């Protein structure tokens, strides 16, 4: 009877080892995906960060990059801990899983919270950012972001083209008689912003604020879904780790 129980325990341990190894392979790939989403956000989708008053959007992306990197390292550690049957490594692996779990939950919560407050933030700050910083010394990133925003989304001004009447640059001699930036024009040529007729510039209902809000919200949904989704998967990893740790402890005795 004792021999049967011992074989049963050993068989259970082997099954757990292979189950945890398979999980770690998938977990490593998930870490790569998380890091890729973070880098994708920072490298390709961060053009408009200079237009945002809050750093939350940027913070969520950095958290995903860090979490993804740690996930990949942890996945390798998990494989080593599993096949070497080292309980101290399993403890470390579990702690790292818990840390990553918390990081991804935080990223998901930040993305969701910022999603809720984005409309208010843009309404309060976007017009001031565009009119007070556009073409001003030291704000080249804002100038570039505004021009790209207006060209990419075919819009002009925060709410409408009339917003540019309050622009410090438009009211200066440097504007060369423009009433809107050239990036508002349907066909961009030098000094095309001198005429703000509908046939010449983009007049979109809701202005650039609506377009930017939709753009940011779409990416916040991706960040939030990835963060929360991977965090949920990690719960199974922690359960498998606890089961294997307990199984090894029983065999030890």
Curated annotation (Swiss-Prot):
Transmembrane in keyword set: yes
Gene3D superfamilies linked: Tetraspanin (1.10.1450.10)
InterPro entries documented for this protein: Tetraspanin/Peripherin, Tetraspanin_animals, Tetraspanin_CS, Tetraspanin_EC2_sf
Extracellular side: 40-57, 113-221
Induction of synthesis: On both CD4 and CD8 T-cells following TCR/CD3 activation.
Result for mutant: residue 7 to R: Complete loss of RNF128-mediated ubiquitination
Membrane side Cytoplasmic: residue ranges: 1-18, 79-91, 243-253
GO cellular component: basement membrane; cell surface; cytosol; focal adhesion; membrane; plasma membrane
GO BP field: cell adhesion; cell migration; positive regulation of cell migration; positive regulation of endocytosis; T cell proliferation; wound healing, spreading of cells
Lipid anchor positions (S-palmitoyl cysteine): 11, 15, 242-243
Tissue: Expressed in a variety of tissues including vascular endothelium and epidermis. Expressed on erythroid cells, with a higher level of expression in erythroid precursors than on mature erythrocytes. Acts as a sensitive T-cell activation marker.
Glycosylation sites: 159
Keywords for this protein: Blood group antigen, Cell membrane, Deafness, Epidermolysis bullosa, Glycoprotein, Host-virus interaction, Lipoprotein, Membrane, Palmitate, Transmembrane, Transmembrane helix, Ubl conjugation
Function: Structural component of specialized membrane microdomains known as tetraspanin-enriched microdomains (TERMs), which act as platforms for receptor clustering and signaling. Plays a role in various cellular and molecular mechanism through its association with both integrin and non-integrin proteins. These interactions facilitate critical cellular functions, including cell-to-cell communication, wound healing, platelet aggregation, trafficking, cell motility, and angiogenesis.
Subunit relationships: Interacts with integrins ITGA3:ITGB1, ITGA5:ITGB1, ITGA3:ITGB1 and ITGA6:ITGB4 and with CD9 and CD181. Interacts (via the second extracellular domain) with integrin ITGAV:ITGB3. Interacts with ITGA3; this interaction modulates ITGA3 glycosylation pattern. Interacts with F11R. Interacts with RAC1 and CDC42; these interactions mediate physical association of RAC1 and CDC42 with integrin adhesion receptor complexes.
Protein name per Swiss-Prot or TrEMBL: CD151 antigen
Originating organism: Homo sapiens
């Amino acid at each position: 009877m004792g021999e049967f129980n011992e074989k049963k325990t050993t068989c259970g341990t082997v099954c757990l080892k292979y189950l945890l190894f398979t999980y770690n392979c998938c977990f490593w790939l998930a870490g790569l995906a998380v890091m890729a989403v973070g880098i994708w956000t920072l490298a390709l989708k961060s053009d408009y960060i200079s237009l945002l008053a809050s750093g939350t959007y940027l913070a969520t992306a950095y958290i995903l990059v860090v979490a993804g990197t740690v996930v990949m390292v942890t996945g390798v550690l998990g494989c080593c801990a599993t096949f070497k049957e080292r309980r101290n490594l399993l403890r470390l692996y579990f702690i790292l899983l818990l840390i990553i779990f918390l990081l991804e939950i935080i990223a998901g919560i930040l993305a969701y919270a910022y999603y809720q407050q984005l409309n208010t933030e843009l309404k309060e700050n976007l017009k001031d950012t565009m009119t007070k910083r556009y073409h001003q010394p030291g704000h080249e990133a804002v100038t570039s972001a505004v021009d790209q925003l207006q060209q990419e989304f075919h819009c002009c001004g925060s709410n409408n083209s009339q917003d540019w009447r309050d622009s410090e640059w438009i009211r200066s001699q440097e504007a060369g008689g423009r009433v809107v930036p050239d990036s508002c024009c349907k066909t961009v040529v030098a000094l095309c912003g001198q005429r703000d007729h509908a046939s010449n510039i983009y007049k979109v209902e809701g202005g650039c604020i609506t377009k930017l809000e939709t753009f940011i919200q779409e990416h916040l949904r991706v960040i939030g879904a990835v963060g929360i989704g991977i965090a949920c998967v990690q719960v199974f990893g922690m359960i498998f780790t606890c089961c294997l740790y307990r199984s090894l402890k029983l065999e030890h005795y």
